[in-house]
């Protein structure tokens, strides 16, 4: 499996950069992770391998993720069967040769909110908590030189490799690692994204410091997270669950988040978007059949979660490493 992560190509790409030493250490580190394995990894990897090996003569990444070809319905059925072996699909949507993977999240809506505020042309990008890589492909579509994603979830890796199977030459890599597995003071990326991660961290300031460690001087952080209304002293800490999620720790106000960024040593922090998450943006589908946002909100008052807390509101902030 490890050869399909294209770590040799990543090393070649990073040769001569501050990241090259790190890249040379990755094969041993990831081989150890694969050795640890996961009970479903063999099944998921088998689904990836069932995808037909056909060319994708036309690829769309700028406006959406879509692979096009002139292949017939039999090929579409084969593609769909393999991709269904990777359910649930959380982030997307994807179009694989006419097979529409209608994911739980309309991640394209978030990208439409975020991308106008970030210049990625020619940039070396790190996407922390990259999920199945949907945003990595869209970042390439926005002109990024290369995108490395880190996420320890094996299903997400296999979903990424399903797309990579048809885009082997594109400079996108998914590493089955957590941010904590990266070396300190990496300082090699022009832009670092952390979207939908901060509220899962027990120590949000430490997360911001670790993100800063990955950036070059002058590099840019793009931070997207759950927020609440309030001033710089407002932070919501759920008593137990938030929207049925157990692993949610801190929901700051935008002003508090800007303060956290300054305390972590970032400069020029600014909020570029605040949006309530709608039940059209996050919902159950054929490709993600479990409960989703409509079930996590109070049926009598959609402005509250089932726990009586403010409904999900997300902010995107951009800041610079001095």
From Swiss-Prot:
Q: Which EC number(s) are documented for this chain?
A: 2.5.1.-
What catalytic activity is recorded?
carboxy-S-adenosyl-L-methionine + 5-hydroxyuridine(34) in tRNA = 5-carboxymethoxyuridine(34) in tRNA + S-adenosyl-L-homocysteine + H(+)
Q: Where does carboxy-S-adenosyl-L-methionine bind?
A: 91, 105, 110, 129, 179-180, 195, 199, 314
Q: Which InterPro entries match?
A: CmoB, Mo5U34_MeTrfas-like, SAM-dependent_MTases_sf
CDD domains attached to this UniProt entry? AdoMet_MTases
A GO molecular function for this record?
Answer: methyltransferase activity
The protein's UniProt keywords, in alphabetical order, are: Transferase, tRNA processing
Q: What's an example Gene Ontology biological process for this entry?
A: tRNA wobble uridine modification
Q: List the disulfide bonds.
A: none
Q: What Pfam family is a match, any one?
A: Methyltransf_9
The answer to whether the entry has keyword Transferase is yes
Protein family according to the UniProt entry:
Belongs to the class I-like SAM-binding methyltransferase superfamily. CmoB family.
Function recorded in the entry: Catalyzes carboxymethyl transfer from carboxy-S-adenosyl-L-methionine (Cx-SAM) to 5-hydroxyuridine (ho5U) to form 5-carboxymethoxyuridine (cmo5U) at position 34 in tRNAs.
Summary of subunit composition and partner proteins: Homotetramer.
**NCBIfam families to which the protein is assigned, alphabetical:** PRK15068.1 (NF011650), tRNA 5-methoxyuridine(34)/uridine 5-oxyacetic acid(34) synthase CmoB (TIGR00452)
Under what name is this protein listed?
tRNA U34 carboxymethyltransferase
Q: Which organism is it from?
A: Pseudomonas aeruginosa (strain LESB58)
């Amino acid at each position: 499996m490890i050869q399909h992560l294209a770590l040799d190509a990543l090393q070649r790409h990073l040769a001569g950069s501050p990241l090259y030493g790190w890249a040379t250490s990755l094969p041993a580190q990831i081989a150890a992770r694969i050795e640890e394995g996961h009970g479903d990894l063999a099944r998921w990897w088998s689904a990836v391998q069932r995808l037909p090996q056909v060319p994708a003569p036309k690829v769309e990444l700028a406006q959406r993720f879509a692979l096009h070809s002139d292949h017939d319905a039999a090929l579409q059925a084969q593609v769909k069967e393999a991709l269904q072996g990777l359910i649930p699909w959380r982030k997307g949507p994807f179009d694989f040769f006419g097979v529409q993977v209608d994911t739980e999240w309309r991640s394209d809506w978030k990208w439409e909110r975020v991308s106008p505020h970030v210049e990625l042309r020619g940039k070396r990008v790190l996407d922390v908590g990259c999920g199945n890589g949907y945003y990595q492909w869209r970042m390439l579509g926005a002109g990024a030189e290369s995108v490395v994603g880190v996420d320890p979830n094996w299903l997400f890796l296999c979903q990424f490799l399903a797309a990579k199977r048809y885009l082997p030459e594109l400079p996108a890599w998914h590493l089955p690692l957590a941010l904590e597995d990266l070396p300190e003071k990496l300082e090699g990326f022009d832009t670092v994204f952390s979207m939908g991660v901060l509220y899962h961290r027990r120590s949000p300031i430490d997360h911001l410091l670790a993100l800063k460690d990955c950036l070059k001087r002058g590099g840019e952080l793009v931070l997207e997270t759950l927020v609440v209304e309030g001033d710089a002293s407002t932070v919501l800490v759920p008593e137990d669950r938030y929207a049925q999620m157990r692993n949610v720790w801190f929901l700051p106000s935008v002003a508090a988040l800007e303060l956290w960024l300054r305390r972590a040593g970032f400069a020029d922090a600014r909020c570029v978007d605040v949006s309530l998450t709608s039940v059209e943006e996050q919902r159950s589908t054929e490709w993600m059949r479990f409960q989703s946002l409509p079930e996590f909100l109070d049926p009598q008052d959609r402005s509250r979660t089932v726990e009586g807390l403010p409904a999900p509101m997300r902010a995107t902030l951009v800041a610079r490493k001095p």
